[in-house]
Amino acid sequence: MADQDFDAAALYDEDYLHFYAGPGIPAEHERQVGDDRSEADADLIVRLLELRPGARVLDLACGHGRIANRLAARGHAVTGTDSSPAFLTRARADASARGVHVDYRQGDMRDLPWDGEFDAVVNWFTAYGYFDDDTNRAVLRGVARALRPGGRVILELNNLTSALRGHRPARVAVHDDGDLFADRHHLDPLTSRLHAERTVVRDGRARTFSFHVRLFAFPELRDWLHTAGFTDVSGHGEDGGPLRADHDRMVVVARRA
């Protein structure tokens, strides 16, 4: 599947916000992205990146501002970019409600306009890997360009090693209002791609679409980062400790050479 086949607007839309942001979201999603988890994520990012007050941070694929607004509340100068107008509208509204400022811009991670501008780049909650391998590699090179020398990137994504051991072929989540969110998964071990068919049922109407995302084991992503111009690559679990094979999620930190 070529990179142009990825339809971000189909995946990241108002339906996604309904099930991942706001009241009544499924319990599984609350554990993943709810307020308590989001505050812990922001603290972990600050700690692993060793961010100083006023650090210039780019939240790449910032979504509805879950991380960007919390980093701004911690005293950092944050820019958030995302391809979804709906997500950016929600992000700006949340920033206003929190009394923080984030420079939100609509954009494409394949065409980043910055050169040496940021102290850190954040890419959180499986927001990387939706294109073909050449394009995914090019995204990392663009991230390196956006960072000042010595700046750091942090990525949080699925851990392929764990996924291969405990693959879930299907999952269903139910909103408090009865709306349904269901995924059928196929993990291809030859390409390290997770192919998903998602069905969303809201107000009695069903919509089904497909997408895929590239998964990584740490050594492969480390090598990709080295090739893109990074060094000092480290792998962590969700708690910031050393990465283990049984961690479902993987946090990777690297420094621009």
Name each region found by the language model.
Residues D134, I154-W224:
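SAM-dependent methyltransferase
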Residues P113-A120:
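A short acidic, Gly/Pro-enriched loop at the edge of an enzyme's catalytic core
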